[in-house]
């Protein structure tokens, strides 16, 4: 609703998300939650429902706004608001919802869980991966396929520098 105020055309963004998914591209959607701008339950629910209609397996990252650079009038996004956004995403049927950019302050919303058995698959702290249990794109506990782009476990996490 407020996207137009920023000079964007929301329909173009939504159409592009649908088109890219239909073409087989891997998508992860990030929503910067800005107090008083796009943090209402209705707006967050609309985003989550839109994504879930395309695929419940599209990861949705809700991130906190910080008063930086030129946009300094709204308050920073509170932890409670970010957690509410994540809960809305989960309640609307999204399998992979993350609350980001507030490391150690969003509980388990940094981690990836199996939608089949709820096992912890990827443990994170901020942008650091502490452990990844996904093997061959599957949950090691129940065998459910976990959508994403996964590397083989025998490859180094960081490529050697030249």
Regions inferred by a protein language model and the residue ranges of each:
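Residues immediately within or flanking Cys/His clusters that coordinate Zn2+
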Residues: 109-111, 136
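Short, non-ligating residues that shape and space the ligands of small metal-coordination modules
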Residues: 123-124, 148-149
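Short cysteine/histidine-rich metal-coordination sites, predominantly Zn2+-binding motifs
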Residues: 128-140, 154-162
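Short cysteine-rich clusters marking metal-coordination/redox-active sites
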Residues: 114-117, 139-142
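Acidic carboxylate-rich catalytic motifs and surrounding loops in phosphoryl-/glycosyl-chemistry enzymes
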Residues: 99-105
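Short alpha-helix
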Residues: 79-89
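Cys/His-rich metal-chelating microdomains
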Residues: 120, 145
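Conserved AdoMet/S-adenosylmethionine-binding subsite of the radical SAM
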Residues: 1-80
